[in-house]
Curated annotation (Swiss-Prot):
InterPro entries: NifH/chlL_CS, NifH/frxC, P-loop_NTPase, Protochlorophyllide_ATP-bd. It comes from Rhodopseudomonas palustris (strain HaA2). The keyword Nucleotide-binding applies. Pathway: Porphyrin-containing compound metabolism; bacteriochlorophyll biosynthesis (light-independent). One of its GO terms (molecular function) is ATP binding. The gene is bchL. Homodimer. Protochlorophyllide reductase is composed of three subunits; BchL, BchN and BchB. The lineage of its organism: Bacteria, Pseudomonadati, Pseudomonadota, Alphaproteobacteria, Hyphomicrobiales. Belongs to the NifH/BchL/ChlL family. This is Light-independent protochlorophyllide reductase iron-sulfur ATP-binding protein. Its cofactor is [4Fe-4S] cluster. It is an enzyme of class 1 (oxidoreductase). Keywords: 4Fe-4S, ATP-binding, Bacteriochlorophyll biosynthesis, Chlorophyll biosynthesis, Iron, Iron-sulfur, Magnesium, Metal-binding, Nucleotide-binding, Oxidoreductase, Photosynthesis. Component of the dark-operative protochlorophyllide reductase (DPOR) that uses Mg-ATP and reduced ferredoxin to reduce ring D of protochlorophyllide (Pchlide) to form chlorophyllide a (Chlide). This reaction is light-independent. The L component serves as a unique electron donor to the NB-component of the complex, and binds Mg-ATP.
Length: 312
């Protein structure tokens, strides 16, 4: 059975076939909403999506959070949802083939694939997958995400998984790259203590709340990353009710871990590293035990964000 249609052949006028994820009508400018097929849901695993401004450190955060869950004894699957397919390289020490790569090799006949063709074991047993995506300017990345989940279910790879982490492309909040929210119970936003990333976080929060009207996903809060201080993030939180759930400081050793293709849990155990490891373990524990309650906050209008942030 061929469960994935070539994304380059997708049209905005409708789905590729009757079994594909449903597509809403276009908005007149070529945009479509990719909606979850009710028959394709992740099972009993806890599912989290990580969003944030491009380059803010989502992949570093996601990978170290995945390891933290694995250190708690959980079976973890990390799914990279970016055509750059670099979400998992600190876990696997290489750029692994994407789902799109391997499907192209078999002319999109998914029944010819084996699990080891597209799922790879990384550090401390974290299972890694890169969804990939169509070339720039073509197809729909959200469709690829939805069909990746279908492929995982087809091979029964979600049955022995406790935690799934979606690491999602930049600050794109279109219907396509919002697709992981349809599978998630909690979404977190990675932001630094600066205007641009908080501005992006505000827009992402609005997208998450829009999805929460039809799906079970709820915003859990903001992970402050690459930031010595958190005063601007906390000011934003006070104005919106969107709380900060973790603080990961701006340390050179974190940058070096990416260059060494390592997670922070593999680096030399300095006091700095141990403190950051403990912060990841604390956050993973709270996420697992559902101690990160859903945010009932209200994102601000763009002009209000502009007026709010900055020094008096």
């Amino acid at each position: 059975m061929n469960i994935l249609t070539d994304p380059l052949k997708l049209k905005t006028s409708g789905c590729a076939d009757a079994n594909a994820s449903k597509c809403a009508e276009g908005d007149g400018e070529g945009s479509v909403q990719v909606q979850l097929d009710p028959n394709v849901k992740i099972g009993s695993a806890k599912v989290f999506s990580i969003y944030g401004k491009g380059g803010i450190g989502k992949s570093t955060t996601s990978s170290n959070l995945s390891v933290a869950f694995s250190k708690l004894g959980k079976r973890v699957l990390q799914i990279g949802c970016d055509p750059k397919h670099d979400s998992t390289f600190t876990l696997t020490k290489r750029l692994i083939p994407t789902v799109i790569d391997v499907l192209e090799e078999v002319n999109f006949h998914s029944e010819e694939l084996r699990p080891e063709d597209f799922v790879f074991e990384g550090y401390n047993g974290v299972m890694c997958l890169e969804a990939g995506g169509p070339p720039a300017g073509t197809g729909c990345g959200g469709y690829v995400v939805g069909q990746t989940v279908k492929l995982l279910k087809e091979h029964h790879l979600l049955e022995d998984t406790d935690v799934v982490i979606f690491d999602v492309l930049g600050d794109v909040v279109c219907g396509g790259f919002a697709a992981p929210l349809q599978h998630s119970e909690r979404a977190m936003i990675v932001a630094a203590n600066d205007f641009d990333s908080i501005f992006a976080a505000n827009r992402i929060a609005a997208a998450i709340q829009a999805k929460s009207k039809n799906y079970g996903v709820r915003l859990a809060g903001i992970i402050a990353n690459r930031s010595r201080e958190t005063d601007q993030i906390d000011k934003f939180g006070a104005a919106t009710g969107i709380q900060r759930v973790a603080h990961l400081p701006d340390l050179d050793v974190i940058r070096k871990s990416r260059l060494k293709k390592m997670t922070l849990f593999e680096m030399d155990h300095t006091d700095e590293i141990l403190a950051v490891q403990q912060e990841y373990l604390r956050l993973a524990t709270e996420m697992w035990e559902a101690k990160t309650p859903p945010v009932q906050g209200k994102p601000l209008k763009d002009r209000d964000i502009f007026d709010l942030l900055g020094f008096d």
